[in-house]
Amino acid sequence: MATIRIHDEQNTSIENQEEVEQFLKRQEVIYEKWDITKLPAGLKEKYDLTDEEKQEILDVFAAEIKDISERRGYKASDVISLSDQNPKLDELLKNFKQEHHHTDDEVRFIVSGHGIFAIEGKDGTFFDVLLNPGDLISVPENTRHYFTLQEDRKVVAVRIFVTTEGWVPIYEKENVNQS
């Protein structure tokens, strides 16, 4: 279940599932909970994935991917795995933590591990969405955001795209978020 942490003076947290869903809906962020128990035991918490294992993950969630793709016009998907096993993890995270936006939605379904999307809210205040296995999020097009990992520094996620080329980040600021 996802939780919210608002970057306000009170550092407000939202943990109740219904309140999380309502908050994200007001921000026009799509949030869904997919059945993670469908994932075969051999793929749970596995971060060094072969191409065949990545395809198996896509196959397991093919119906869900097809459903959201038909509703939203998405055309492609893949699986990304980030962990300390990747020697370039710190470099990747530095790039991910730069505020950016896209001209299409950024969609992630968390298969294993954890991730955080920091998203600029409608009022200009950023909020974090702390994601866990089974959580799907779609950050709307032209919404400033960045992604990072939680303390465990590992995630496997299905990425879903509007085009077969994937997405291209548009950076407007030079700074890199370090918080």
UniProtKB/Swiss-Prot annotation:
Cofactor: Fe(2+); Ni(2+)
Keywords: Amino-acid biosynthesis, Dioxygenase, Iron, Metal-binding, Methionine biosynthesis, Nickel, Oxidoreductase
Tagged with keyword Glycoprotein: no
Site (May play a role in transmitting local conformational changes): D105
Site (May play a role in metal incorporation in vivo): E99
Record text on cofactor binding: Binds 1 Fe(2+) cation per monomer. Binds 1 nickel ion per monomer.
Binding site for Ni(2+): H100, H102, E106, H145
GO biological process per UniProt: L-methionine salvage from methylthioadenosine; L-methionine salvage from S-adenosylmethionine
Annotated site residues (Important to generate the dianion) in this chain: R108
Enzyme Commission number(s) from the entry: 1.13.11.54, 1.13.11.53
Catalysed transformations (reactions): 1,2-dihydroxy-5-(methylsulfanyl)pent-1-en-3-one + O2 = 3-(methylsulfanyl)propanoate + CO + formate + 2 H(+); 1,2-dihydroxy-5-(methylsulfanyl)pent-1-en-3-one + O2 = 4-methylsulfanyl-2-oxobutanoate + formate + 2 H(+)
InterPro entries in the cross-refs: ARD, ARD_bac, RmlC-like_jellyroll, RmlC_Cupin_sf
Gene3D superfamilies (UniProt xref): Jelly Rolls
GO molecular function, one term: iron ion binding
Pfam families xref list: ARD
Positions that bind Fe(2+): H100, H102, E106, H145
Pathway annotation: Amino-acid biosynthesis; L-methionine biosynthesis via salvage pathway; L-methionine from S-methyl-5-thio-alpha-D-ribose 1-phosphate: step 5/6
Family as reported in the entry's similarity comment: Belongs to the acireductone dioxygenase (ARD) family.
Role: Catalyzes 2 different reactions between oxygen and the acireductone 1,2-dihydroxy-3-keto-5-methylthiopentene (DHK-MTPene) depending upon the metal bound in the active site. Fe-containing acireductone dioxygenase (Fe-ARD) produces formate and 2-keto-4-methylthiobutyrate (KMTB), the alpha-ketoacid precursor of methionine in the methionine recycle pathway. Ni-containing acireductone dioxygenase (Ni-ARD) produces methylthiopropionate, carbon monoxide and formate, and does not lie on the methionine recycle pathway.
Subunit structure: Monomer.
Name of protein: Acireductone dioxygenase
Organism (species): Bacillus licheniformis (strain ATCC 14580 / DSM 13 / JCM 2505 / CCUG 7422 / NBRC 12200 / NCIMB 9375 / NCTC 10341 / NRRL NRS-1264 / Gibson 46)
